[in-house]
Amino acid sequence: MAGTPHTELSPELLAHMQAIKAKASEYGLDFFEVVYEVLDFETMNQIAAFGGFPVRYPHWRWGMEYEKLSKRDAYGLGRIYEMVINNDPCYAYLQESNSVTDQKLVMAHVYGHSDFFKNNLWFSKTNRKMMNEMANHATRVRRHIERQGMETVERFIDHCLALEHLIDPHSMFMAREEPRRVSGSDDAGGFEPHKLPSKGYMDPFINPESEMQRQRDAHAAEVKSGKGRIPERPTRDVLLFLLRHARLDEWQQDILSIIRDEAYYYAPQGMTKIMNEGWATYWHSKLMTQHFLEAKEIIDYAEQHSGVVHMPPGGFNPYKIGVELWKEIERRWNRGQHGAAWESLDSIGQKEAFDDKSMKGREKIFEVRRIYNDVSFIDEFLTPEFVDRYQMYQFRKDPQTGEVRIVTRDFDRIKQTLLFQMTNMGQPFLYVVDGNYMNRGELFLSHQFVGLEIDASKATQALKSLRALWGRPVHLMIRVNEDNWLYSAAELNGEPKREKVGEDLPKPAHGLM
């Protein structure tokens, strides 16, 4: 794909941008400076294929994504109106074929996103100079390609990408260290003694064999006594465990660290999709309808906005659910419809009519914007009335008639299913529970069941990539239909084998399921 041709805002768009920015600030939005670039649809698709960045490391996935976006445009199945990057300053891309009305809507939307990026707790640990960091990642990967060859590096990246979701987003807010290091060597059940840095010819003097053997003996004694378990506790950040304990070459460690860093950068976006898109939609709606929409633009705006928030029966549109839930929170706190006094009212009619004129809605939504993610947002503020109003029921298509039918209207079941799907961004919880399984240097992972079963086909693919990176047999215990199954990848590039877990299975260092 080509470079990144771009144009600056026209004088007309610049004037609109300055007015929208000033009004957004008056409302209390606190955003990073936003740099706008106007792109043609081809360049827009290129950057979208790169995940919103103009430069990424070489890999076939970007070309595949570009082809998908180009075909979508060609068949009229949709187009990208805007992209905004969590960076300081934020970078926002506008489609040059958009009307002026569309561009104003997008700019108002972007300031909502930028405010959310800057102030939401879950974004607070992200790299605010990721535009530069992505370019740095690309340079490093190209350097490895020059030395190792494109095919070798690309194959390794494929394995890393198959595991990119095996991180622990909450660990950014906690200190979780794993000081012990293990390798796939045969000595002492896979233990690798700690060595001081030294040049090759000095190594026997700096790291004498007597000291290496002392460490091996001490480790063996710990293992025998049960104190030397690796990891010391179940570890959710599988990529970090691999970086610290797998036998990887330096170039492989560098690439795996790049994939992990980028996964952590994108994680908060997955954790706050409903809140973030709803927040941006709330503000573009308020700014446009109350301040920047001219009479001649009403129809165009209504058409564009309705497209953004359209949600068919059985569908789930984060823009729609997000914006309506933000409005609902504001309405309830404006009227005091929360707390013990309101909860004690007997009837739905009394609750709906209650109004203490407290007008705390705006204050409340800014508070929620600061500290919540999608799981806590839905858990605390979704109500049965909201589910009924927007028909957030569970639907299923009848295989015989093709009709979409309601499966359940039960609020608790609907809410629980939503929370299951949002927890960990819909990805399974996998933990490393033993890095030296059966004292053979094998890796054992376990799936923590939280209501939704793991996709066995995806699990086996991830297992094959884990086997490639670990260098020794890898095992994964998962739950399927109330039974526990063990998937084992013993041979490199071989298909994992499956067996039902029985009482005779040797126990890993830690239990989980």
Segments the model singles out, each with a brief description of its role:
Residues L69, P89-V106, A267-M275:
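Short pre-active-site segment immediately N-terminal to the catalytic Zn-binding motif
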Residues T4-L9, D73-A74, R79, M83-D102, ...:
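Aromatic/His-enriched, Gly/Pro-containing loop or helix-boundary segments
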Residues S97, T101, A220, L293, ...:
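Non-catalytic terminal regions of proteins
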Residues K224-V323, K327:
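Long, internal scaffold/assembly segments composed of regular secondary structure
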Residues P5-L9, L13, L94-S97, F117, ...:
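Fold-level signature of zinc-dependent metallopeptidase catalytic domains
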Residues D115-D186, E277, T281-L293, G307-P318:
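Post-HExxH zinc-binding segment in Zn-dependent metallohydrolases
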Residues G3, P11-C90, M212-A246, E250, ...:
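Auxiliary, metal-adjacent structural segments of Zn-dependent hydrolase domains
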Residues T139-R142, D158-L248, Q252-L256, Y319-D412:
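Well-ordered beta-sheet/strand-loop patches within structured domains
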